[in-house]
Amino acid sequence: MSLEEKKKTESKEKDKALSLVLGQIERNFGRGSIMRLGDASRMKVETISTGALTLDLALGGGYPKGRVVEVYGPESSGKTTLTLHAIAEVQKNGGVAAFVDAEHALDPVYAASLGVDVENLLVSQPDTGEMALEIVDQLIRSSAVDLVVVDSVAALTPRAEIEGEMGDHVIGSQARLMSQAMRKITGNIGKSGCTVIFLNQLRLKIGVTYGNPETTTGGNALKFYASVRLDIRRIQTLKRGTEEYGIRAKVKVAKNKVAPPFRIAEFDILFGKGISTTGCLLDLAEETNIIIRRGAWYSYEGENIGQGRDNTIIWLDQNLEIRNKVESMVKEKLTEGTEVSSNSMKALNSNPANTIAVNDIKTVA
């Protein structure tokens, strides 16, 4: 037998042994317990829209289904608003969403104004961190819930801390709780297809001279288990004269296992109304040269449609036929591969200020 024939025989034997062991594993542990990475049907990740077109682009489609997502940032930066929009999107598509309100601060009126069906929203206000995470785990295992939001990790107080006295040192109890919960949750989350979004607060590390002193609460487990981590910041207050009517938010995709990370998205959050979808559309239409800005004036197909960004947004909202036409043109250009700031890393590389400065952030308790 020649050397080439010997290699072919060995290769056939290996293929046969591999198919046998794969079949045995699937019989023992179920279909999908082991797979080839090139299996296209398994590689495709379904997503949930964030409610902001620019952020959907930065994430590669939206929040991935069957994954853990962490959203963190300073106070009043738009974390809860972001998740309420995700809940509204899930409900629009006939899905079921749950909100685990560990902070006991959910405003049903505000949620309804963002499009959330509060009548059918599952809400839990747990007494302890253990109770909250057990509820999350049971909702995931039911396979009947599409999205679970936990607001927030910082408010998941361990039972030992609640039952103890003020001033008692229970070092690392919350980190241990989160570590145990993540090990338990991630085993079930992929099978159920449920997305879990954890909101988190920022703290400052004591004595850090070099590097970023910011850190999130609850230890490091969530950082490792999360497929997507979003850093949301308030970069501007929107005003009409002296009246404040919203904020400009910047979201950096700090981690993404299902699409390229480190992309940046910006959008407006209007008080009482949530994310300005028309504002996102105008930004993208300007970047793709569908709407042209010259000075303060915006024009569409050679005709001026508004002086200033706010007036142009109002005009688009009043002329829905043209707005829908602009939206379809923007989506067509993006499908063709047109690069904009939300799906590019150029903005990040050219602007070191995107590692947003620390200001007005809660210090370590």
Swiss-Prot record:
PROSITE patterns: RECA_1, RECA_2, RECA_3. One of its GO terms (cellular component) is cytosol. It comes from the Bacteria. The keyword Transmembrane does not apply. Transmembrane segments: none annotated. ATP binds at residues 73-80. Gene3D superfamilies: P-loop containing nucleotide triphosphate hydrolases. Keywords: ATP-binding, Cytoplasm, DNA damage, DNA recombination, DNA repair, DNA-binding, Nucleotide-binding, SOS response. Its main location: cytoplasm. The keyword Acetylation does not apply. GO terms for molecular function: ATP binding; ATP hydrolysis activity; ATP-dependent DNA damage sensor activity; damaged DNA binding; single-stranded DNA binding. It is found in: Cytoplasm. Coiled coil: none annotated. Can catalyze the hydrolysis of ATP in the presence of single-stranded DNA, the ATP-dependent uptake of single-stranded DNA by duplex DNA, and the ATP-dependent hybridization of homologous single-stranded DNAs. It interacts with LexA causing its activation and leading to its autocatalytic cleavage. Belongs to the RecA family. This is Protein RecA.
